[in-house]
UniProtKB/Swiss-Prot annotation:
Residues 143-157 have a biased composition (Low complexity). GO terms for molecular function: RNA binding; zinc ion binding. PROSITE patterns: ZF_CCHC. A zinc finger (CCHC-type) spans 265-282, 287-304, 305-322, 328-345, 372-389. GO terms for cellular component: nucleolus; TRAMP complex. One of its GO terms (biological process) is nuclear polyadenylation-dependent snRNA catabolic process. InterPro entries: TRAMP_AT-DNA-binding (IPR051644), Znf_CCHC (IPR001878), Znf_CCHC_sf (IPR036875). This is Zinc finger CCHC domain-containing protein 7. Residues 41-64, 133-157, 443-494 are annotated as: Disordered. Residues 449-463, 477-486 have a biased composition (Basic residues). It comes from the Eukaryota. Keywords: Metal-binding, Nucleus, Repeat, Zinc, Zinc-finger. Component of a nucleolar TRAMP-like complex, an ATP-dependent exosome regulatory complex consisting of a helicase (MTREX), an oligadenylate polymerase (PAPD5 or PAPD7), and a substrate specific RNA-binding factor (ZCCHC7 or ZCCHC8). Several TRAMP-like complexes exist with specific compositions and are associated with nuclear, or nucleolar RNA exosomes.
Length: 563
């Protein structure tokens, strides 16, 4: 194309609009376009230092001798000049693209390092320019061996006649890059995008898409990747977990398990291993009730549901016989909302009882604490049952947290009897469907009935301290006191002091025996009364003078036999 060096220099002067090569000033237009190429070059900030091999670099070296004197400063570097094919075309007014590559990065300010790939075929003697010149058309030409042998740095110009425009490209390389380029020619990769009509410079993010060509699916063996495709280059294959995981238990629309999860799962429906309940072939279980725990019904239709008014099972609040809970008053704690049989004090009295048996009572009376806060108004000095302000929840009535009385065995037995009678009333009304089941021992634990033994009455020592002993003693003393008074009055009537006025009166004549049995009954009563009087007289003889005692002796009458 250019036979002489003079023609080459003349063309170079026309290209750069320079009169002499000794001019050290930098053209402002060239500097502007150079900065624009650096700024708009793709993946400038995303380039990594790991991708150093096989890539072109765009650098801006500060100094006045950037264009013409850049190669003279480094004479030991080998220069590669890309020559484009000749054809008739017009020279474009656009600024040429200058690509500078330098192995040493000490003086560089802007650098872009991207992997370089060469096409496997040379169509009409064209080669790839490099990923840095995305804003320029694809221009390439076979490199001549004459220019490779030259070691002196020379500026070369080229023309591209595709589309009727010329685009000048200046490529400066070092000797180390030529060796890497020769190695990379041996490893040639053909991509689908190169075979299509769309060229590489028309695609955005081409550098990222190049790596996607190495993705392979459903691998069964292993493959060693080349160094150009990745730095690892290690042998890899499908993980053993992927092979061992037998993921066949899933619906066609959604996978039920991941490959790393354990397949030894237990089904909640059939209690077998290997599948989940949603994939179980056995029909699903019926729902369980939260009240009775049986399957086949829900809480609303449970036969053992309980009432919120009387707290008994079998019916709801609307069907309850008793009055509403807000109209009830407890005679045990004097609180509204319940009766004595459902008083919370019943279970609250077992706060000291640990073992089965009688309820333990505290030795000292535990009163209310000095520092008390109300949970309704959050004020100090009173509890919720003493609060006079409006309730936060009007449906629930307050109760006292203190224990006023402790139950005895008699009270517990009576309360159980009352609950049984209440259950019978509900059964008659048809509100309680479940039957009462008493505790029955199993046949294994059942024992033959023991012989009945005589009940031994407790001795006097054992009786001491009971309430009945005190009551019996009081009644005995009262009876003795009454007997003493009655005995003294009878003695004075039988044994008067002095001669009373009634003694002068004549005695009435006795009646004769009529032959009836009524007389015998009267005589028996009279005899018993006389015996009682004599006993009382002996006891009270010390209180009466012996001289004044007149003992009346009567003759015993012989009983007549009735013929």
């Amino acid at each position: 194309m250019f036979n002489c060096d003079e023609d080459l220099k003349a063309y170079e002067d026309e290209l750069y609009h320079e009169e002499t090569s000794s001019d050290e000033s930098i053209d402002s237009e060239l500097e502007f376009h150079l900065y624009s190429q650096v700024h708009y070059s793709q993946n400038l900030s995303e380039s990594k230092p790991e991708e150093d091999t096989g890539g072109d670099s765009v650098t801006y070296v500060p100094g006045a001798k950037q264009q013409n004197n850049a190669c003279t400063e480094k004479d030991d570097k080998l220069v590669d000049i890309i020559i484009l094919s000749d054809s008739d075309a017009k020279v474009s007014d656009t600024c040429p693209v200058i690509i500078l590559s330098d192995t040493t990065e000490e003086d560089s300010v802007y650098s872009s390092k991207i992997k370089k790939k060469y096409s496997s075929t040379y169509v009409q003697g064209e080669s790839l320019c490099g990923p840095c010149s995305h804003s320029t058309p694809k221009v390439s030409a076979p490199q001549s061996n004459n220019f490779k042998s030259q070691k002196s740095c020379q500026n070369s110009s080229s023309k591209n006649y595709s589309g009727g425009y010329v685009q000048e490209v200046l490529v400066i390389r070092g000797s180390s890059e030529d060796e890497e380029a020769n190695k990379s020619e041996n490893d040639i990769i053909i991509s689908e995008s190169d075979m299509s009509d769309v060229e590489n410079w028309m695609l955005l993010g081409r550098a990222k898409e190049d790596g996607d060509a190495s993705i392979q699916l459903n691998l069964e063996g292993y493959k060693i990747l080349s160094d150009d495709e990745g730095e690892r280059g290690a042998a890899w294959s499908i993980s053993e977990k992927d092979v061992e995981a037998q993921i066949g238990n899933y619906t066609p629309l959604r996978r039920s398990n991941r490959y790393y999860t354990d397949k030894n799962v237990v089904c909640r429906n059939c209690d077998k291993r290997g599948h989940l309940s949603k994939n179980c072939p056995v029909p699903k279980k019926l729902p369980a009730c939260c009240l009775c725990g049986e399957r086949g019904h829900y809480q609303n239709s449970c036969p053992s549901r309980y009432c919120l008014n009387c707290f008994l099972p079998g019916h709801f609040f609307k069907e309850c016989i008793e009055r509403a809970y807000w109209r009830k008053t407890c005679h045990r704690c004097s609180m509204p909302g319940h009766y004595a049989d459902a008083c919370p004090e019943i279970w609250r009295q077992y706060h000291l009882t640990i073992k089965a048996g009688p309820i333990k009572k505290p030795k000292s009376h535990s009163g209310q604490k000095d520092i008390v806060y109300c949970c309704n108004c959050a004020k100090k000095g009173h509890c919720i049952y003493e609060c006079k302000e409006r309730r936060m929840n009007s449906d629930k009535l307050p109760t006292c947290q203190l224990v006023f009385s402790y139950d005895h065995e008699y009270d517990i037995r009576k309360r159980n009897e009352r609950t049984k009678s209440k259950i019978k009333d509900f059964q008659k009304a048809g509100l309680l469907t479940c039957e009462m089941r008493e505790f029955s021992e199993s046949k294994v634990d059942a024992k033959p009935p023991a012989k009945k033994r005589k009940k031994k009455h407790p001795s006097k020592k054992e009786r001491k301290g009971t309430i009945r002993d005190y009551e019996c003693a009081e009644t005995k003393q009262k009876k003795k006191h009454k007997k003493r008074k009655s005995g003294l009055q009878e003695i004075e009537g039988d044994f008067p002091r002095g001669i009373p006025n009634s003694y002068v009166e004549l005695k009435k004549p006795s009646k004769k025996y009529d032959g009836s049995f009524l007389h015998l009954d009267k005589t028996k009563d009279m005899f018993k009364n006389r015996q009682k009087k004599t006993r009382r007289g002996k006891r009270c003889s010390s209180a009466v003078d012996q001289d004044l005692l007149i003992i009346k002796q009567k003759k015993k009458k012989s009983k007549r036999k009735v013929a």
